Amino acid sequence: YSNSSYDIVSKNDKIYIIPGGKSLTGDNSFNKAGSVMIYDYEKWSVLEPSVVQNKLNTWPKDYTSIVVTKNDTEKEIIYVSSFGYGLFQFIDREPSAVYNKTNSPLENAHGNEGFYCRVDGLAFDKEGNLWMTNSEVSKAIKILDKEGKWHSLSVESLNGKYTINDI
């Protein structure tokens, strides 16, 4: 458990909390280990960072936003954005994917190598598409549609900006 909660959401009679954050001074992180804490009104459960690292070969940290949905087969899908590590996906509380510049249109800030895939502002539209912001890049709005296809939008007033938050 953590006393460093950064985002909280209530969905499906559960409460989901993530520690994390982002710096306003330009450095990459607060170095908060990425866990997802879930309270189902009876008990707490935690999706531990070590499990994510072992399964996805990426250390999760500096989470910035969380959204929860269900897929067509009623499996719980959790998406968590990170300020440096991209977008994490959990299916039925198991780490299933991390999206970054190697496997999606998500970009690293200013084309830097390493852990600069700065994602925030997760939100679903009424069709079930996942929208997000991608800071300090040429196309600041990214969309993962319900079919699993990625789309990028260029919004001149947002492109290249630091710490874009919610959509």
Can you say where each PLM-predicted feature lies in the sequence?
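Carboxylate-rich, polar loop motifs that coordinate divalent cations or form catalytic acidic clusters
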Residues: 1-167
